A protein has these predicted regions:
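Acidic/hydrophobic-patterned starts of short beta strands in beta-sheet-rich repeat architectures
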Residues: 111-122, 164
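Acidic, small-residue rich beta-repeat scaffolds with periodic aromatic anchors
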Residues: 37-74, 161-230, 275-278, 283-286, ...
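Sec-dependent N-terminal signal peptides
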Residues: 24-33
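Beta-propeller blade termini
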Residues: 47-49, 100-110, 152-165
Length: 338
């Protein structure tokens, strides 16, 4: 039994005109049905590309009463979302006095999630300084104070590598430097260097994916610690040198990382495919390759003599997030108004 959109009296269609009109009506009814359920690619592309970016304006007013000789600073910090009052930021209680014009109020994507955060100077000495930090929460769309980031000494936020560099100068002969990343939404220190020229002692500490470990201090002069490969026989550290090449340092698992490495290779190169990252090194007729699998987060060590494979071992791997996924930000806009 056929189905019709309309009930039709066939007696009215006994001549060609009616049959012609019938065909025209059916054609007009049928054309829209052809497009029903089909994807209009041009319209879909527009929808996919359309991204709503909120604009936040933060208005800051100094309410400190200098004449009262109070030792605290007091500010009014109002957040406007798309030109409407949205949040009143509360500053820490008993915030030590610091000149308003030297607070360096600003915004930056501190935790590299694509959203700008809000910060200003908390403490400043002759060399070292720290920030009061408010991270943007994309769920509540509010700026929330975070003491972990505020505890970092003299931070520098490096978007290119998605790292936070920290510097602390104790005196003219004592220096500390640290590097932090955001790992599983948690601030994580991945390296620390201590240079004490007065006592002639030096330390180099790295994060191996589970814990911090002390490493031979001669390896501390690097641009960036990249990753740690652990096989059943070897512990391997991959570093990025100042010349843009990679360094391979390897120890037998039975040896302490504070000892000199069994093998150091420089001038390494990085190669990347859709699912893998490889760090390749050569020494004469031997080549060493550390492979990280993006899908499993594990890897392999492969050793070749000329083209012959001598060794292949599975490895647990810690690797810098930026090596796997580069920064993509600019999800909203923050304007500071004083």
């Amino acid at each position: 039994m056929g189905y019709s959109l309309f009930k039709v009296d066939k007696s009215k269609y006994n001549n060609k005109k009616y049959f012609g009109m019938k065909k025209l009506i059916l054609l007009l009814l049928f054309i829209p049905l052809l497009g029903f359920g089909q994807d209009d690619s041009s319209e879909s592309e527009v929808i996919k590309e359309h991204v709503v970016r909120n604009e936040f304006s933060i208005k800051i007013t100094d309410l400190s009463n200098i004449e009262s000789r109070k030792t605290e600073s007091e500010y009014s910090i109002i957040v406007y979302k798309n030109n409407e009052v949205f949040q009143n930021i509360i500053t820490p209680a008993n915030m030590s006095y610091h000149p308003f014009e030297e607070r360096s109020f600003g915004s930056a994507d501190i935790n590299f999630d694509g959203y700008d955060d809000f910060l200003f100077i908390d403490y400043m000495a002759m060399v070292n300084y720290s920030y009061i930090v408010y991270l943007y929460n994309p769920l509540s769309e509010k700026f929330e104070i975070n003491e972990d980031y505020g505890s970092i000494s003299s931070p520098q936020f490096d978007i290119d590598y998605q790292i936070i560099k920290s510097f602390n100068r104790g005196n003219a002969a004592y220096y500390e430097s640290e590097i932090y990343i955001v790992l599983n939404d948690k601030l994580t220190r991945i390296s620390k260097t201590i240079d004490n020229y007065q006592s002639n002692t030096y330390k180099y500490i790295i994060y191996d994916g589970k814990k911090e470990v002390h490493v031979n201090e001669a390896l501390r002069r690097v641009n960036l610690y990249i990753g740690f490969f652990k096989t059943k026989k070897f512990n391997i550290i991959i570093d990025l040198l100042d010349n843009g090449k990679y360094r391979y340092a390897s120890w037998s698992v039975s040896r302490n990382l504070r000892n000199n490495p069994d093998l150091i290779l420089k001038n390494g190169v990085k190669q990347e495919s859709e699912n893998e990252i490889s760090y390749k090194f050569k020494k004469g007729e031997f080549s060493y390759t550390c492979i990280f699998n993006k899908l499993t987060n594990n890897g392999h060590l492969k050793v070749f003599q000329n083209q012959k494979e001598l060794l292949q071992q599975k490895a647990s791997v810690f690797i810098m997030p930026n090596e796997v996924k580069q920064y993509t930000g600019n999800k909203h806009k923050v304007i500071i108004s004083l």
